[in-house]
Amino acid sequence: MYRTHRQHSLLSSGGVPSFIGGLVVFVSAAFNAQAETWFDPAFFKDDPSMVADLSRFEKGQKITPGVYRVDIVLNQTIVDTRNVNFVEITPEKGIAACLTTESLDAMGVNTDAFPAFKQLDKQACVPLAEIIPDASVTFNVNKLRLEISVPQIAIKSNARGYVPPERWDEGINALLLGYSFSGANSIHSSADSDSGDSYFLNLNSGVNLGPWRLRNNSTWSRSSGQTAEWKNLSSYLQRAVIPLKGELTVGDDYTAGDFFDSVSFRGVQLASDDNMLPDSLKGFAPVVRGIAKSNAQITIKQNGYTIYQTYVSPGAFEISDLYSTSSSGDLLVEIKEADGSVNSYSVPFSSVPLLQRQGRIKYAVTLAKYRTNSNEQQESKFAQATLQWGGPWGTTWYGGGQYAEYYRAAMFGLGFNLGDFGAISFDATQAKSTLADQSEHKGQSYRFLYAKTLNHLGTNFQLMGYRYSTSGFYTLSDTMYKHMDGYEFNDGDDEDTPMWSRYYNLFYTKRGKLQVNISQQLGEYGSFYLSGSQQTYWHTDQQDRLLQFGYNTQIKDLSLGISWNYSKSRGQPDADQVFALNFSLPLNLLLPRSNDSYTRKKNYAWMTSNTSIDNEGHTTQNLGLTETLLDDGNLSYSVQQGYNSEGKTANGSASMDYKGAFADARVGYNYSDNGSQQQLNYALSGSLVAHSQGITLGQSLGETNVLIAAPGAENTRVANSTGLKTDWRGYTVVPYATSYRENRIALDAASLKRNVDLENAVVNVVPTKGALVLAEFNAHAGARVLMKTSKQGIPLRFGAIATLDGVQANSGIIDDDGSLYMAGLPAKGTISVRWGEAPDQICHINYELTEQQINSAITRMDAICR
């Protein structure tokens, strides 16, 4: 049961907690009356002496002075939820919210425009209506909303989605550890195949100390026939530089790919952080699409490093949740099918035309050493600087430079906002390079980008671009190669089996590159997308080509999708083509359902079908069933059966996933080639967070996280999450918070134990990047008691206020027959009851509850006030 303790409670004659209708009506009337109102005590009791002092209500006061947790609404928009101190301004003016200049400024009121604010202390209560004409402050007691209204001219002019830096929270000091373990045990019955086991562990550890974030990403892997290997992928120290709207990084990171190709480095970088901008000023992230012909492992790499790995079912897939390390630069996508075959292709990614709003400056400065995972490249020092400036008339000017021992490059560009015709940008890069054979080269590269959304047609040209480079143009990465040609091998690769996708030849420099990304909404008929790229090279006719098409629609409950994928890379003997048809049909109406409404919302069941055909005419077909179980929908299973026309073999899989409060677990089994190849796979992921209040286990961490602290509210669900609940101490970690944005963190009051009440069920936080922000919930674990009070055999006065000693927020009001309802009471304590300001207008109730009374839904008892 949820109850706000800062709001006093009354009892109806039936004993159910509520406000006495008569008092509320008359208090409300008094609050809104223009003339002074007087309460006749005889209205409430025949004996006026049995009524408490109601003079405060005669002045229109609905509440007593104190701190109340309220929603703050500015011009009909909720801007914050926090504790506000209500004080008595003067006996004549009564009680009002104490709003300071500092708090009003944080809400978005333009206090600088009114000189009177500067004459007040920043912590002094502001008479808002006296300073800003037509301003008003109203407290809605029933909804606990502090409603502030000011003229629009007194509001700061901010972009949509803007959150002022004053509300950004650096978080608490903590030690963080995220882990992800996966393993597979394979059995191959054929003589030419080896059975084997493989294991992979990814550890993301870190320390938060004030605004500083220390992070390390390491992996451990072991396969049959190979020794175990640890890899340190990256380590860095990072912090936000709020005055510069930027971020300082010391250690391993990537440069942005807006101007020059993105490269991995180890060094120092100071760069603008677009996350600090409102959503309306931010760009887009890459989406990786493809088609799997079987239960496949998807690996996404950048600069030789694995940045993303997952398993997908047969059919079309889409990955849109890549980490920020892969926010620029081309991505290598590898699809490893169940039979061991690997299909790989490159997904180009560039930002939309590099436009900035007028006056906006975006910068990046890097002093570092080139970092690579390839044994074919050296690690040399380099420097890079870039700058963008939003000019007048919808223009953006940008440029940058790169400097290394064997490389010099400078670029300059200009972007235009063409209004209804979209946005374009054009830039040129001049480079001088010295290659591995000591040959010197000079060249230029020209790039054109275009983006446009046709709202009335539902068409989005998310990105159309073309780059042309002369034969003498090379990139910084090209000058890092130790040889003019060869095969790249990353640490741990089998050098006896080179892959065509790893071959490089500096003689074949890049020439022209065209890329297109178009999506179209068709209303009730669905939507389709078309994306493609083509890279040509000097001194060869070979090309890299990627073309993807997809159409998705909904026919009543049936979801239908069609997709086609074509990829051909330089050096690849033949192109890969896959056509796929998939559909899913919900089965909820056919399966037994829970009567619980909460469970019904969380449980789903659907049938899936995937059919794919490759360019050689081989067909794979899969039919599956997927269902979510348990009250929170955090247990799911999937069963699939398939057929492959190549070899006329059957395949199948079964898996189960459990998303728990302290970890996520998965186990699966699949077979192929009529059972001659079998595999058992399993995974476990989660986190451990050490902080000043203890150690908390949780689900996998995101970049930014929230620590819920609700002592007394153990095993309570977190709203809008799956499987997440507080531990035995009332703590849990909510992962994947959005940095520099308002995050609404809420506990599900319906899952509270019956002897627990929450003072606040919702906390709003605005974390900085990488922060672990504390969201505190005040839970009162204790008994709910209905007391029949008396003093010297006479019921206590109607309207008297009762307060639990030591807990000012926990209080109640005596009703018309002397009854008092209070919740969250400890087993033993003292309640003070006051019906006036005189020293003799107070008495005390000493009580002691049994264990049975504490655990009861409500306890009724007589109480003597002395």
From Swiss-Prot:
Its main location: membrane. One of its GO terms (cellular component) is cell outer membrane. Pfam families: PapC_C, PapC_N, Usher. InterPro entries: Fimb_usher, Fimbrial_membr_usher_CS, FimD_plug_dom, PapC-like_C, PapC-like_C_sf, PapC_N, PapC_N_sf. The keyword Cytoplasm does not apply. One of its GO terms (molecular function) is fimbrial usher porin activity. One of its GO terms (biological process) is pilus assembly. Part of the elfADCG-ycbUVF fimbrial operon, which promotes adhesion of bacteria to different abiotic surfaces. Could be involved in the export and assembly of the ElfA fimbrial subunits across the outer membrane. It is found in: Cell outer membrane. Residues 1-35 form the signal peptide. PANTHER family: FIMBRIAL USHER DOMAIN-CONTAINING PROTEIN YDET-RELATED (PTHR30451:SF21), OUTER MEMBRANE USHER PROTEIN (PTHR30451). This is Probable outer membrane usher protein ElfC. Belongs to the fimbrial export usher family. SUPFAM superfamilies: FimD N-terminal domain-like. Induction: Expression is negatively regulated by H-NS and subjected to cAMP receptor protein (CRP)-mediated catabolite repression. The operon is cryptic under classical laboratory conditions, but is functional when constitutively expressed. Keywords: Cell outer membrane, Fimbrium biogenesis, Membrane, Signal, Transmembrane, Transmembrane beta strand, Transport. It is a multi-pass membrane protein.
